[in-house]
A protein has these predicted regions:
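General beta-strand structural signal in soluble alpha/beta enzymes
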Residues: 3-6, 40-41, 73-78, 114-115, ...
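Glycine-rich loop(s) and the adjacent beta-strand/alpha-helix scaffold that form part
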Residues: 37-91, 232-249
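Core beta-strand elements of the Rossmann-like FAD/NAD(P) dinucleotide-binding domain
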Residues: 28-37, 211-212
C-alpha cells in the first residue's frame, strides 16, 4: 500500500458517468491518480463553524466533492454540538458530567440560568452533545446566547463538594486535564458551544455505494445512519462497520472494470482571498446554524 500524506483532493474525475480517479495537490503541483474504484472517508464539516472541537481540516471537502460528482447529501443540518473551553486551553471538551456541580455565570457575574436550576443541571449532566428532546436544552441555549452577547462566554466554578470529594468519573477527567492541559478544579474557566461531529453527509446504500458508479463512502463523510441526535461513541462504530463494507465493495467493483484513463482535464479555479471568505463563513455558521436557528437567520446565511 502506498500512502500519500499531506495531499488534498481537488476533484473527483469521471469518465462515462463513472468515477475513475482524482486530482490531488501537494501544495505545489497537481497530480492525477486513476483508479477503478474510490472510497471517500474524509470526515465531517465541523470546522465550518467558528468554534469547533475537531481539527481544522474537517471542513466538508468530501461532501463537496461527492455533490459535484453527482451524489446526494442527506441530513446536513444535523450537527453534534457540545460545550467546550473558550479559555484557558481553547477547544478542550467540557465534561458534561460536571454540570451538576457547577455555578454558571455571565462575564458580568449575573447567573446564567434563572429560577431553580439544580434539576436542570442534573439532567444536563446525563448527555454530552446538545439535544432538543430534553428540557436540558435550556442550558445549551443559554450558553450559546451568552456567547453571542459576549465572546468571553460563560464562567464556570465548581462546588465545594466536587472540589473536596469528586466522584471517580469526575476525578479521572480532572486528572487528565491536569496532565494534558495543566488545569485544576480551582482554575477559572469560560465555556461556549462548539460544533463537533456531523450527523449528515453523503447518502450511501447498505453496501456504501453512493449511487455514482465507482464511488463509495464511509465514516463521518456519510449521512443517513444517524438522526438529529447521535449517542457519543457511535461514530467509531460507524467507521468500523461501514469502513469494512466500503473496502469490500470497492474491491468487488474493480473486478469487471477497465483500466482508468491515463490523463484527465482539470479546470483550475482562482480565489481572491480564501482565508477571509472562510472566516466569514465560520462566523455566519456560528451565528445562524448552531443550537438556535430560525428562518430569518438561515435565509440570511
Amino acid at each position: 500500500m502506498t500512502i500519500l500524506s499531506g495531499r488534498e483532493t481537488l476533484e473527483l474525475v469521471r469518465a462515462d458517468g463513472r468515477v475513475c480517479g482524482a486530482v490531488i495537490t501537494d501544495g505545489a503541483e497537481l497530480h492525477y491518480l486513476g483508479c477503478k474504484a474510490l472510497v471517500l472517508a474524509t470526515g465531517g464539516y465541523g470546522s465550518l463553524f467558528r468554534h469547533h472541537l475537531c481539527t481544522s481540516d474537517v471542513e466538508g471537502l468530501g461532501q463537496a466533492l461527492a455533490l459535484e460528482a453527482g451524489c446526494r447529501l442527506v441530513n446536513m443540518e444535523f450537527m453534534q454540538i457540545m460545550p467546550g473551553y473558550l479559555s484557558p486551553a481553547y477547544q478542550t471538551i467540557f465534561n458534561e458530567k460536571t454540570f451538576r456541580f457547577t455555578d454558571l455565570r455571565r462575564p458580568d457575574g449575573a447567573p446564567l440560568l434563572e429560577g431553580e436550576t439544580a434539576s436542570l443541571l442534573e439532567l444536563r449532566a446525563t448527555h454530552g452533545p446538545f439535544t432538543a428532546r430534553l428540557p436540558s436544552k435550556a442550558v445549551d441555549l443559554a450558553i450559546y446566547r451568552a456567547c453571542l452577547e459576549d465572546k468571553r462566554g460563560v464562567r464556570v466554578t465548581y462546588s465545594d463538594e466536587m472540589r473536596h470529594s469528586p466522584p471517580e468519573f469526575v476525578k479521572t477527567y480532572f486528572d487528565w486535564l491536569r496532565e494534558a492541559r495543566g488545569l485544576t478544579m480551582e482554575d477559572p474557566i469560560q465555556i461556549g458551544m462548539f460544533a463537533h461531529a456531523a450527523n449528515g453527509g453523503v447518502w450511501i446504500a447498505p453496501d456504501t455505494s453512493t449511487g455514482v458508479p465507482g464511488l463509495f463512502a464511509a465514516g463521518e463523510v456519510t449521512g443517513g445512519m444517524h438522526g438529529a441526535d447521535r449517542i457519543g461513541g457511535l461514530s467509531t462504530a460507524n467507521g468500523l462497520v461501514f469502513g469494512g463494507k466500503a473496502g469490500s465493495s470497492a474491491v468487488a467493483a474493480c473486478t469487471a472494470v477497465q483500466e482508468p484513463p491515463k490523463t484527465c482535464l482539470f479546470k483550475a479555479v482562482a480565489a481572491a482571498d480564501c482565508r477571509k471568505v472562510f472566516a466569514d463563513l465560520q462566523d455566519t455558521m456560528f451565528h445562524h446554524a448552531m443550537v438556535e436557528r430560525d428562518e430569518a437567520g438561515l435565509s440570511a446565511a
